[in-house]
């Protein structure tokens, strides 16, 4: 038995025994029997190297282990920090085709290695961990990398715990804190994570649309938290937040603010309003702290009035709440209104009697919480600056030309006008120097464009009514201009990009990403589809992609309603029914006939026919996206493209189907036989009698199927999450600088910056992460453009 000590120089065998502790090196304790060779043998810088010397059996076992690991897939042995959400493909292998997996005995021990045996079994204080990491020093690059890595790891672990808790809430495995209240108002607490459902249980959003507005607000709150995390203002804190969509319900998970559950005589909300504007706080310290936030988000200081008519100045919306926790930190909560209203859409589509609604068959939009995206505000602000600079340059050129003409005229008439006093055309300063007249002087360039997040809200309307103002303020006008810019410039420009294939999204996710990058909300999908001609062959495919995105989102909302009206154990049958009614009508015209007796007892399922589903989809698309689907859209657009739509719907809902060939028409027996033989890996080779019997049984089973998707094909429901992820700002800056250098032709500098960004991403996020994969892909393209195809293939392999 050897006893090993770890020191700054490495590891060495000490002189301890089973009954006596002696940290002295074993080679020195032997005295005269020791030699330089023994000293080298009993110590090493690496623990692995020392163990290999001491135990030949360990050395052989380690060599065998490394040999076995070299034969595995890279993703099975690569270390990873963690990710916000595990990859959940929409098609997975069933139990009969599942690939054997090796159990990693080291993974359950990781928490003990990080936290110790005692802390691993205790409740984690998620909020204190997050705020402590945020307060870590970041004065140099190494400190920033360590801080970013710890933040990413915390967010990943918090998201993992929040997903497990949210699934327990939906499955009814967690008791609520207020069991006597209605189900929509239930709150939950487990492992120091607070859970609530995405309903308007407290009637906060009654005037904005009720549950529909509350559902939107939860997602916008994540966007607001993400904005503040990117700004990373010292002294301003946010909560860890995750929104989880699972089995038709939305659950919000948040870390707990210190002291939030304690009753205090004085209110903790010191900034903003907690009672819909009855009282509005404006703490001076909070106001100063929010000044850099307002500057970064282009918010101006604006006035709001409470119910008593008292006027206060705020930077953020009154719905954003500033709170001082018992730990002395300042927190911002309810960040769903961190951008202004889309006032043009609100006035034209969200109010009955408006011309845009009255002149069409479209219903009134289902909620009034229609906000602009932060990307659009940035684009509009930059566009406004560009226009102002151009106008200033034109005016400056005109002034210069005018002064030159005036100077020439003065030169010609210098003799005759020499006796005249120049006081009429020039002023003299204190030093006696002549300068142009104040009437002709062009002022220095100044630009100011601020938005009010409370523009066109009831609180601002109350203030205007008090002061008797009828016209819009400058900040209100800026909000209206941004809304018009979205409708009249951004949306048509994006439609032209799609029509000309300047932007070529290949999936619904890529389309959504492209729209969000341009600041376009999903409610404008219908407007984009209307701008794309349906009779042009080259545009037909991209228009179908836009329409399928609307259809899949409409089906998601329909399924959400069905799940809430159906027992949990019938969700698989309910989903299979919807999928068959949507993409399986060419094989079975009445899928509801094949429901189980228990499912037929649910009225919503028994009455669901393909025609009824198509009408409901058309109604949802018209309501949510302001687009009128053709009455025969299933026959004209879905037929022949069922697999594409099936994939989009499954990804939107969060479901995993069995990996097999789905026949949307009744297949022939020969086709089924060939597919099964090919899937089993036999090809044209000889099969045994047992194998032939198995193939025949499988063929008969497929031929007897009446539906495209059976309820047994629904293997799993996965949780879809929205996480307020923290990105590494320095790594992102290096990445963008590298891309810009490559576009400018500076290949060497660009490649160096990209490799530096790649190293930072690997240190922060690990190898197995989407951000790291993005860097690998861009570096691969840079090498490919330079003709270095082997390096390009190597980096692209790592990206994939």
Feature roles, as predicted:
Residues 1, 198-200, 206-238, 294-307, ...:
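Eukaryotic beta-rich interaction modules
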Residues 21-90:
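Glycine-centered motif in EGF-like
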Residues 8-48, 268-274, 337-381, 793-799:
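Aromatic/acidic cage segments in peptide-binding pockets
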Residues 316-341:
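Conserved metal-phosphate-binding beta-hairpin within the catalytic cores
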């Amino acid at each position: 038995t050897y006893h090993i000590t770890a020191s700054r120089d490495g590891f060495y065998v000490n002189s301890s025994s089973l009954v006596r502790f002696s940290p002295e090196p074993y080679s020195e304790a032997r005295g005269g029997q020791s030699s330089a060779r023994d000293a080298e043998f009993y110590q090493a810088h690496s623990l692995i190297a020392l163990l290999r010397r001491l135990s030949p059996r360990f050395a052989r076992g380690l060599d065998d282990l490394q040999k076995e690991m070299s034969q595995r897939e890279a993703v099975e042995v690569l270390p990873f920090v963690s990710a916000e959400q595990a990859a959940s493909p929409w098609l997975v292998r069933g139990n009969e085709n599942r690939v054997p997996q090796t159990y990693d005995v080291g993974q359950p021990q990781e928490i003990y290695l990080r936290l110790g045996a005692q802390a691993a079994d205790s409740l984690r204080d998620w909020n204190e961990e997050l705020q402590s990491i945020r307060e870590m020093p970041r004065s140099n690059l190494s400190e920033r990398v360590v801080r970013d890595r710890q933040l990413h790891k915390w967010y990943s672990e918090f998201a993992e715990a929040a997903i497990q808790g949210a699934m327990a809430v939906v499955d009814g495995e967690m008791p609520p804190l207020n069991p006597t209240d209605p189900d929509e108002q239930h709150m939950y607490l487990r492992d120091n994570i607070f859970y609530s459902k995405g309903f308007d249980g407290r009637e906060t959003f009654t005037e904005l649309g009720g549950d529909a507005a509350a559902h939107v607000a939860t997602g916008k709150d994540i966007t607001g938290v993400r904005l503040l995390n990117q700004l990373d203002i010292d002294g301003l804190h946010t909560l860890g937040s995750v929104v989880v969509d699972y089995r038709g319900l939305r659950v919000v998970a948040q870390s707990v603010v210190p002291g939030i559950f304690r009753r205090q005589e004085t209110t903790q909300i010191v900034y903003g309003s907690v009672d819909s504007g009855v009282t509005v706080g404006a703490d001076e310290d909070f106001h100063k702290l929010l000044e850099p936030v307002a500057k970064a988000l282009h918010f101006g200081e604006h006035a709001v009035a409470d119910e008593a008519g008292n006027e206060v100045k705020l930077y953020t919306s009154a719905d954003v709440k500033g709170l001082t926790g018992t730990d002395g930190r300042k927190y911002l909560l309810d960040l769903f209104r961190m951008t202004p209203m889309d006032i043009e859409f609100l006035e034209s589509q969200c109010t009955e009697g408006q011309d845009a609604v009255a002149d069409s068959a479209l219903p009134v939009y289902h909620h009034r919480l229609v906000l602009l995206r932060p990307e659009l505000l940035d684009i509009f602000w930059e566009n406004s600056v560009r226009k102002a600079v151009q106008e200033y340059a034109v005016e400056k050129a005109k002034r210069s030309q005018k002064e030159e003409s005036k100077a020439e005229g003065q030169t010609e008439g210098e003799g005759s006008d020499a006796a005249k006093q120049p006081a009429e055309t020039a002023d003299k300063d204190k030093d006696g120097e002549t300068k142009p007249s104040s009437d002709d002087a062009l002022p220095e360039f100044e630009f100011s464009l601020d938005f009010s997040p409370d523009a066109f809200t009831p609180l601002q309307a109350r203030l205007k009514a008090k002061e008797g103002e009828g016209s819009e303020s400058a900040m209100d006008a800026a909000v209206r201009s941004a809304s018009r810019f979205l409708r009249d410039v951004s949306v048509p420009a994006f439609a032209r990009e799609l029509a000309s294939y300047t932007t070529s999204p290949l999936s619904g996710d890529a389309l959504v990403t492209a729209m969000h990058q341009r600041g376009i909300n999903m409610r404008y999908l219908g407007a984009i589809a209307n701008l794309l001609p349906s009779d042009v062959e080259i545009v037909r495919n991209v228009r179908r992609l836009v329409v399928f995105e609307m259809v899949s989102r409409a089906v998601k909302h329909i399924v959400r309603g069905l799940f809430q009206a159906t027992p949990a154990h019938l969700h698989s049958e309910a989903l299979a029914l919807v999928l068959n009614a949507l993409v399986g009508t060419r094989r079975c015209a009445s899928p509801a006939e094949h429901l189980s007796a228990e499912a037929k007892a649910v009225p919503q399922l028994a009455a669901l026919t393909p025609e009824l589903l198509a009408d409901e989809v058309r109604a949802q698309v018209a309501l949510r996206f302001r687009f009128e689907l053709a009455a025969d859209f299933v026959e004209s657009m879905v037929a022949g493209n069922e697999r594409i739509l099936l994939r989009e719907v499954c990804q939107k809902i969060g479901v995993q189907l069995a990996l097999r060939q789905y026949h949307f028409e009744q297949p022939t027996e020969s086709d089924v036989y060939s597919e099964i033989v090919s899937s089993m890996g036999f090809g044209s080779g000889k099969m045994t009698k047992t194998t032939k019997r198995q193939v025949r049984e499988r063929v008969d089973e497929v031929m007897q199927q009446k539906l495209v998707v059976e309820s047994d094909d629904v293997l799993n429901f996965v949780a879809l999450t929205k996480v307020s992820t923290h990105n590494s700002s320095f790594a992102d800056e290096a990445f963008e600088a590298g891309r810009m250098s490559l576009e400018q032709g500076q290949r060497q500098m660009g490649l160096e910056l990209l490799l530096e960004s790649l190293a930072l991403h690997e240190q922060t996020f690990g190898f197995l992460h989407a951000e790291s994969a993005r860097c690998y892909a861009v570096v691969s393209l840079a090498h490919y453009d330079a003709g270095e195809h082997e390096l390009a293939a190597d980096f692209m392999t790592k990206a994939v």
